[in-house]
Amino acid sequence: MDWIKKIALVSALAGVVCVVASCRISMGLAPISSIDCSKVKTITIAEFPNRAEYVYAPMTTEFNQKLKDMFIQQTRLQLVNANGDLEIDGEITGYNQYNEAVAADGFSSKVKLTMTVNVRYVNNTNHEEDFEQQFSAFQTYDSSLLLTDVQDDLISKMIKDITEQIFNSTVANW
């Protein structure tokens, strides 16, 4: 009788091993895009100059790099210097701060930092999708802090937001 239990146990374990070995769960981020890969293979992303009244030089470099990285990492498009199937260009048009919330003492307690980018998008395989549009993002910070102390972190967050908006409006069609 013991040998029947042993055979049943070994058979059950072998069955579990076979089921586990035949199942594979794959997790990861798949490229997110709704472009027709049979027609669209390349993208040209021009350098966006900073034409805002207030210029913070590191913002321009970070924005240009993050925008290119977004398309390289999340699509199969090849980045080319000119004449891409898709073309994106534009300029940073706004970088401003505004007093937002007034405290009981009559002074501002929060400051709103905004960034605005004008984008021109051309789809050379389907010109019905071409557009020119402004994208903006903002972050707030406590007015007791100096802008120079929080600027880099806030700019990174705004750039992430704006590059996602641009990506979604161009190739993700959201």
Question: Model-derived features: where do they sit?
Answer:
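Bacterial N-terminal signal peptides that target proteins for export
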Residues: 1-12
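Surface-exposed short loop/turn segments
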Residues: 31, 73-78, 85-130, 138-149, ...
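Conserved acidic
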Residues: 55, 59, 109, 150, ...
